[in-house]
Structures are given as structure tokens and as C-alpha cells.
Amino acid sequence: MMESTRKGCWGEERVLRLLRRRGWQLVSQRWSCRYGELDLVLEKQQRLLVVEVKSRRSRGLDLWGLSAFNKGKQLRLKRAIGCWLATHPYFAEHSLELVLALVPLPPSRNTLDWIRIDDLDIDAAD
């Protein structure tokens, strides 16, 4: 397994454990379509939480991966969410929130940084 894939999986698992402790239930993990991949999709009380996980070894100028979440990535992610909703119609009436989880590596006492992504205008796409 490539180093970046291991880091990504470790970061996703760390975020998933935390969210499960907070009552969220996993619906999809590493779901992909032609637009890209959704790292985590979770559900709780008629709410959907889509989490894009960025794991980095150092915070530095990159802020643990924040610079990788550019406008192009955001557009692809929103399109992927539309595809996911089209293939999971049961969740169409759920409210939707997209967050970016910035995970420091290696494991440390550093907390996760959560950034809520606003302005979601997503329609189910094919």
C-alpha cells in the first residue's frame, strides 16, 4: 500500500471513530464515481455529514492539507455528492453538511481541525 494511501486510511479511521462516539452512523466510506471519491458519509437524525479527510505529517503552511482543498476539488466533491444522492434516494430529504477534517500525523495530542464548507447547492446527478 502506498504511503499516501496508508495516511489517508489512518486519518479516515481516526475521524470515523470520533464521529461514531458522537452518535453518527457510517453510510458510505471511500465511495467513488466519475467525479471523485467521498471519504466518509455519515447519518444521524435525518442529517447527512460528508467528510473530506486530509491527513498530513506537519501543519506548516499547508495547514494539514487545507491547500489541497482548492476550488476544483470542491467542485468535484459537490458533483460526487450529487451522484451519491442520486444512487441513495432514501437520503434525499436529509439535511446535508460538508466538512473538511484536517488530521495531523503521526498520532499525537494534536486535535483535529474541522472546517465547515458552506454554500452547498447540490442536486442529485446521474
UniProtKB/Swiss-Prot annotation:
Pfam families, alphabetized: UPF0102
Task: State the Gene Ontology terms under molecular function.
Answer: nucleic acid binding
Q: What SUPFAM superfamilies does the entry give? A: Restriction endonuclease-like (SSF52980)
Which domain of life does this protein belong to? Bacteria
For this protein, the parts annotated as crossing the membrane are: none
| HAMAP family per the UniProt record, alphabetical | UPF0102 (MF_00048)
State the family named in the UniProt similarity comment for this chain. Answer: Belongs to the UPF0102 family.
Report what the protein is called. Answer: UPF0102 protein P9303_16141
The record lists the organism as Prochlorococcus marinus (strain MIT 9303)
